[in-house]
């Protein structure tokens, strides 16, 4: 998969290219990340990349010419079929369904804004889609771009150590992930659930699904509103709610 980065701070992406799952993907040749800085396309001796906005107001905008030239260079390197994305608070909010959708593209170009943003005409002329990672303000598009890259890279065959990992991630089926445990079996009096030590894979699968449904109900109930639960899922969720109510009643009685 090819991912081009247009950013004033390409060095930030070493966190993606040199470390962790994405770093291994780059080393294995599964992920090709290249970057272009608008500063390298500035024509003046100060390498200016910002300009004043028409109409006044605080802050500056990214200068049109260096930014467009950097985008054009990224497009030329990517070749036909590259989707150009601008990381923007005005964009579609990234979720697991969106990640899965973006992962079907073999070529992405991510444009990272700075200052107060970019000229609207650049967005209209050069950008295919705008994406956001949440309703809050950041200093630039680099961190959202890294988030997008990390999440999309998990779908590339061979990137994860276990192919089931991406399938079982939180949100992969619209639910939060279930609790996980490793050694020791007892930690400060807290024991690993016996079912996970039983070796009964059918019961383990059932327990994990119940916990996943229950955790979603407790922490992100709005996610369940968009799901058509199977008969098994509905039954397990009902069991979880009953067990949770019993635990709460027991806890309240001890208080």
UniProtKB/Swiss-Prot annotation:
One MF term in the entry's GO annotations: tRNA (guanine(37)-N1)-methyltransferase activity
Keywords, ordered alphabetically: Cytoplasm, Methyltransferase, S-adenosyl-L-methionine, Transferase, tRNA processing
Enzyme nomenclature, EC number: 2.1.1.228
A family per Pfam: tRNA_m1G_MT
A cellular component annotation (GO) from this entry: cytosol
Signal sequence range: none
Family: Belongs to the RNA methyltransferase TrmD family.
Functional summary from the UniProt entry: Specifically methylates guanosine-37 in various tRNAs.
Name by which UniProt lists this protein: tRNA (guanine-N(1)-)-methyltransferase
Species name: Salmonella paratyphi A (strain AKU_12601)
